[in-house]
Every structure is written in structure tokens, then in C-alpha cells.
């Protein structure tokens, strides 16, 4: 069950995951939650009724799915958190990137692009998403001791990129001399750049994002976005598919998975 296919990268994840799983002999049922947490809960319950072996979740709201995951576990179904950790749910596996490193790379790019320093905004993703906290940590730790100052922060709840419009407009009123904007992903960056363009600031304010979306790469060529942290989505999706199929076949987490991460209540 996928948060939404509005974000380009989830389409790429889906295509690679489905192709890999089918090559391994698995049947795959993909559901689009349409950016609706309640719909995603309904989809998980549907999968439970269909007696799926494994449910892979790209969470809409990382804090809203723990009871649904508990129902899946009670039915003997394994659950994987894919790139967004389901909080307080004790999912069987969490597979993602090194999100702290993503934040570090974004900060390093900012320092490179703004050598004279100045004010920057952080327009991040959902506050309930553990990845957002990790990216923020890496970003802020890297900026410590630099001449860049974070003067405005906001979170786009539910990863709703359109919320960035009001945030940036508000921030620009107070800090019109902003030098850079860190965006939670390229979808958010697209909204931020739209506001900058309306204020004749596109290309003058450094904008960084992540995901390597095609549109972001085009904006980099145009000069309105400075960088996007590229992540090998294909590798992540293939690996997740292999683990999901193996989990379905063996009924347990693969023995080569040894690292743990805390989801708020469980390791």
C-alpha cells in the first residue's frame, strides 16, 4: 500500500519492486492510498482479509498505522516499513536509505553554494516521519559552526507539498534576504521554487532537495534548483522485493538482517 503516486519517485519504487517480486515468483497487489491515512488503513485491513503473506507499507501518516499493523500481525502476516518507518508498530523490517547522510549532503551543498553565509529556511516533510528527523539531524549537525543560519522551519504534514507555498510566503515576508532553502524532497522544492519565481527570486536563492526526480534535474539545468540528493531507488526497491519474497517463503525475517532501529516503542 503506497501513500500516493503524486510523488514521482513512488512510481519508480513500485515498478521496480513489482518486476523484481514477480521475477521471483510472487503475486503482487498494489494499492494507492491517495494521500489518505484512513484509506491506507482500509487497504491494510483488505490485505488481511485476503490473507496476504507480507504487507509492504509506504506510510501516509507514520503515526496512524500501528493498530492496523497489530491486526496484520495477529493474522500471522509479516509487515515491512518501506522508506518511511511506521511508528510504534514493531514492523518486521524497516528498509531505507542513510537519511542522516542525505541531510549532511544537503548541508554541504548549501555551504558550497553560499560561501559568504546568510539566512536559510528549512521546509521539511511530515513531522511524524522518522526519516525527516534523521535528515534534519544530519543537516543541522553539518551546519554547526558554519556561517549559515536557519531562521525559519516548517513541516509539510502528510508530505503535502502544496503547504510549502504558504510557509515560504510567510518566511519571505520576515526574511526577504534569504540565501537558501532546504526542502524535504523535490516535490516540496517544486512548490518552493514556484513562490520564489513569483517573487523574482528563482535562481537567486539556493534550493536543495532529494529524490532525484526528473523535474528536479530539469530545474537544476535551468538554474532554479541547486541540487537534489540522488538515492538509488531501484536498488532499494529490488532489495525490498527480495526480502519480502524471502519473508513470505520462510515466514520470518532473513537471518542476514541484524541491525535494529527504534520506532518509538520497539527496536
Locate each region found by the language model:
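Hinge/beta->alpha junction and helix N-cap segments in small-molecule ligand-binding domains
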Residues: 1-15, 29-39, 60-61, 84, ...
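Hydrophobic alpha-helical
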Residues: 45-49, 54-73, 139, 152, ...
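Short, hydrophobic alpha-helical segments
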Residues: 48, 110-115, 172, 240, ...
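Hinge/cleft segment of the Venus flytrap/periplasmic-binding protein
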Residues: 127, 131, 141-143, 239-267
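Extracellular/periplasmic ligand-binding modules, especially the Venus flytrap/periplasmic-binding
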Residues: 185-193, 221, 231-251
